[in-house]
């Protein structure tokens, strides 16, 4: 008879969790930031608020965003005008749209990841789904499992309303699942649609205007597993360690409340300072065991909460300008897609590294860090190890 220790050892993988494939997707509807103030005040019937529109235009100009993809169209707003009001009851119709569309957008990204992975979907043992858009039972994880035709026995984890740090959360969760279940292949999906947060302008809610200028829609999927079979699987990044912490006395710094009017967001003006002043402590705790203290020796995948956050982090830890280039590129091309952002950046980094002939998937560097920031104020830190591009 086997002992409990023998059983536990047999259940565990031998090597670290590894990202084996990445896929991304967006809605078709693309809005350019240079035109967005005009569009936003027109579709929300707010063109009479001329001074507020000027403020919003300045916010858009400073956002460093070129374009975003948004599921919500002008036609949908005409049909459901309460969504475009500042504080009109609209949760029912928002929920109807979101609960249908979030799994569909997630499916598009998942299919791309599954195609890159190249293995039968029956080999997916676990599904981790994350969204800040909508809540229902059974959840978006259940709907996605059915849309993809995954096995009924797939072990599902559904994460709702984690916010912008959750790209790190899902990787941390997938790491634990992959390393503690030998042979596990974990499909991770983040799908975000801003239908839940879109609303018209108000003089009394400038933080809401910041959100309207920054957030976009997108979904990203990764497949994670330990001990890859290199004859049929291509490792991209190893997940070496993962940690989460929150900054004391900062619960209201980034906050969201689900109400009859949708999901309302509130931001403190000092969010960039709070994050930048606490990030080095996270770096030190993560990289002391490895013996790394030069933050410019790492490749960086940071959630692009906004240009002010990136500028503050860059200055505080003394980063070279090119370190956040991939992050700034995704912010420019897609806006802030909440939990999906860091996975988009991961995809951008490995593709650009290959295209530019770098020796590793991490811009030619071996070690990297992935950061997520969000409500709490919560910080997720994932230590990454890149893979040689000759194996890809």
Swiss-Prot record:
GO MF term (any one): trihydroxystilbene synthase activity
Enzyme Commission code: 2.3.1.95
UniProt-annotated catalytic positions: 164
The reaction(s) this protein catalyses: 4-coumaroyl-CoA + 3 malonyl-CoA + 3 H(+) = trans-resveratrol + 4 CO2 + 4 CoA
UniProt-annotated location(s): Cytoplasm
Pathway recorded for this protein: Phytoalexin biosynthesis; 3,4',5-trihydroxystilbene biosynthesis; 3,4',5-trihydroxystilbene from trans-4-coumarate: step 2/2
KW Cytoplasm (keyword) present: yes
SUPFAM superfamilies, sorted: Thiolase-like
The entry's keywords: Acyltransferase, Cytoplasm, Plant defense, Stress response, Transferase
Pfam name, any one: Chal_sti_synt_C
Alphabetical GO biological process terms: biosynthetic process; defense response
Gene Ontology CC: cytoplasm
Residues where substrate binds: 55-58, 267, 305-307
Record keyword Magnesium present: no
Biological role: Mediates resistance to pathogens which are sensitive to stilbenes.
Oligomeric form and interacting partners: Homodimer.
Membership in a protein family: Belongs to the thiolase-like superfamily. Chalcone/stilbene synthases family.
Protein name listed in UniProt: Stilbene synthase 4
Organism: Vitis vinifera
